[in-house]
Amino acid sequence: MPPAISAFQAAYIGIEVLIALVSVPGNVLVIWAVKVNQALRDATFCFIVSLAVADVAVGALVIPLAILINIGPRTYFHTCLMVACPVLILTQSSILALLAIAVDRYLRVKIPLRYKTVVTPRRAAVAIAGCWILSFVVGLTPLFGWNRLGEAQRAWAANGSGGEPVIKCEFEKVISMEYMVYFNFFVWVLPPLLLMVLIYLEVFYLIRRQLGKKVSASSGDPQKYYGKELKIAKSLALILFLFALSWLPLHILNCITLFCPSCRKPSILMYIAIFLTHGNSAMNPIVYAFRIQKFRVTFLKIWNDHFRCQPTPPVDEDPPEEAPHD
């Protein structure tokens, strides 16, 4: 018999389904926009596609698995562990994609004349592949042994049972808090976030310094170039801010769990933290639509062409912005 679902669980499931219904179509639209608009094909937008793929997977895979875990089925330990690992992989992929985006924007303003020779499509593809490979290594580490199998086996043996332990599948019953705090948070989440903050501060400093310079007749219109860079940098920094705002509460709660085992964590706080992490996947397409004109125009074209059956003229694909001369 499947476990009965309480009214609270039903509300939780309803909110999760709503988040998924916003996240999946929104991020598919982001990927679609990059596919149809040549002006969205530079390295930054390739990294944005990688981020969108992770967000689609959150809505299509992680949220259904989170609902399953919330219902609390009894499973073999390693089955539950495999259910818990995808969220770790996708979170790490998002962080590394955001870091790649930050580095890309830094290079655009630091070496505008050499940017296209340094950041080639091939190198961008290699960076994206590297981010995903590293994400799988970090996210699957619990499967390689850093988990709570020993505790589960002792409890299982104490009941006089043999074989692989069967447990009520919950995240904290299979994932070690030492892994979540010392390895995941202190190594793979917090340092990249702090590094990205420093990178964006440097990006804004470089752009402001360039915009403050006097324009000469042969400068290649740096005001226009750096003005566009400033707008895009602000939008991408907002994406980073929302990511940090969404994920830090859950990691802080994990720290409390590890360092203060006797401290009570109200269930409502855990649910809010989980909603924030999943909801972050639905936020990015909204930011793109309101903050980045190329995305907004392409979204409207896709809507008119494929959903309203009112074909519109081709998207005005701006030529690549000419880098200013030194």
From Swiss-Prot:
- Residues with an annotated glycan are 159
| Lipid addition sites, S-palmitoyl cysteine | 309
Query: Which regions span the lipid bilayer?
Result: 11-33, 47-69, 81-102, 124-146, 177-201, 236-259, 268-292
**Which residue ranges are assigned to the Extracellular compartment in the record's topology?**
1-10, 70-80, 147-176, 260-267
Query: Which PROSITE patterns does the UniProt entry name for this protein?
Result: G_PROTEIN_RECEP_F1_1, G_PROTEIN_RECEP_F1_2
Residues assigned to the Cytoplasmic compartment are 34-46, 103-123, 202-235, 293-326
Instruction: Show the InterPro entries listed in the entry.
Output: Adeno_A1_rcpt (IPR001068), Adenosn_rcpt (IPR001634), GPCR_Rhodpsn (IPR000276), GPCR_Rhodpsn_7TM (IPR017452)
SMART domains, A to Z? 7TM_GPCR_Srsx (SM01381)
Which biological process, per GO, is one annotated for this protein?
response to purine-containing compound
| Gene Ontology molecular functions | G protein-coupled adenosine receptor activity
Q: How does it sit in the membrane?
A: Multi-pass membrane protein
The cysteines covalently paired via disulfide bonds are 80-169
**Annotated family:** Belongs to the G-protein coupled receptor 1 family.
Protein name listed in UniProt: Adenosine receptor A1
Source organism (scientific name): Canis lupus familiaris (Dog)
Provide the organism lineage as a comma list: Eukaryota, Metazoa, Chordata, Craniata, Vertebrata
